[in-house]
Amino acid sequence: MSIRENIASNIITVMSAVTSPITLKKVTREPFDVDELSEQQYPAIFIQSGNEQRTDETMTSTSVTRQGVADFIIVGFVKGSGTNIDTKRNELISTIETALESDRTRGGYAKITQIVEVSTDEGTLFPIGGIRVVVRVMYTYTAGTP
């Protein structure tokens, strides 16, 4: 597997193991139709590999070391009532951030992991709440093995 794929797999593994402050009921890399989720599948997230920037770091006569800065997009959904949907969205965001901060090297595959953007549906999906978290990961690899 490539380092980028190993990082994506690490994010799935970490998110699947979360139990506090909330337990994620559905964690996948495949987008899903939120209207098809049962009550028992909330909160649910999917993770997608996003854009990446690559630059050469070092070159020798036999290899090139590159740095990749890749974005991974986490899209999540919670379900609540009129009095707690914003709280549930915030709990989901906090859960994701806490889990990712537990190992910013993504199992040794990355130099650093940062959450660079958080956005919400701002109530447009009520009674479902949606969030989007952009996770930026910096890593190095040998050219030909991203």
Region locations from a protein language model:
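Charged, amphipathic alpha-helical segments and their flanking helix caps
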Residues: 1-42, 46-146
